Amino acid sequence: MGFLSSLFGGTKDADSQKKKDFDILKYDGIRAQRIGKLTYAIKCFKEAIEIQEDLETMSHLATVYTQVNQMEEAKAIWIRMTELDAENPIHFLSLANHCYMSEDYKGMEEACKKAIGLNEQIPVAYYLSAKAAIGLNNAIQAIAMLTKAIMLKEDYADAYQLRAEVLWSMRQAKDAMEDINKLLEINEEDESALLLKGEIIAVTEDAEKAMELINQVLTMNPFNEKAYLLKGNLLLAQKETDQAIAVYNEALELNPNFAQAYHERGRAKLAKGDKEGSMEDMKKAIELAPENGANISGQYNNYDHLTKNVPF
């Protein structure tokens, strides 16, 4: 009996020590993450997971990997979580979100399909699937997914907004405006909805009314960067070059690192004949957003490309 007691007692002691070590590493990692010591947090979480593949700890590790831009390492953790808890759609949605940040739209689409296969009643699964479809240049599929999301959640503001944007990209102004009006019923001060409404009205109806909507947004939020871009562009379209430059100047006072504002101010300066000033702004825009440099031409005629991936 003494031998058996010591044998099983030793096993219990070892298990208890492992549990203690795991807890210390896990919570040291969480504390390190909170105070920004991310390298140490990764070390703690990795060692904790070697003891026990705890889903919460793995989620923390994947998040920290993302924070330090180790995207492949983060993806591997999310995938492992889907393997450990394969019946939980939330892990597949977390993987989908990660794929979106990595611009892996095919992987995002697959993760969403698996989440929907596990539970067809999660609105965000269809919303994320729509974002994947947009990334894959499939607007029709995006609209179908957003419509399903809205059927499950009638006040799903993000889904209405995205569907309106997709419809407007297809120049379906009437349908887009219906979604915008629904958004404004939900929240009459929805800045994104008001700006999109202004953008559509500027093209299809009345530039003066569009300007009123843009100014309304700037009154509510003087830091709304897209509002400055739309206002400046509207003034440029009306040949009000000096006023447009003044709008971009104001935007740059608020955010000196606003690459799109430099680009648009350069376009305005070129229209005014200030080639030197235009070139300076173009160079500054490329300096701030080098990934978009190849999309900026000397004529500034491709603004859409510059803002393609801006999360407005």
Predicted regions and their residues:
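Position-specific recognition of the canonical hydrophobic site in helix A of tetratricopeptide repeat
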Residues: 33, 66, 93, 100, ...
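Canonical tetratricopeptide repeat
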Residues: 60, 94, 128, 162, ...
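Helix-start (N-cap) detector for alpha-helical repeat units in TPR-like alpha-solenoids
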Residues: 22-23, 55-56, 89-90, 123-124, ...
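Short coil turns that delineate tetratricopeptide repeat
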Residues: 52-53, 86, 120, 154, ...
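Alpha-helical segment of the N-proximal tetratricopeptide repeat
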Residues: 18-56, 60-67, 94-103, 131, ...
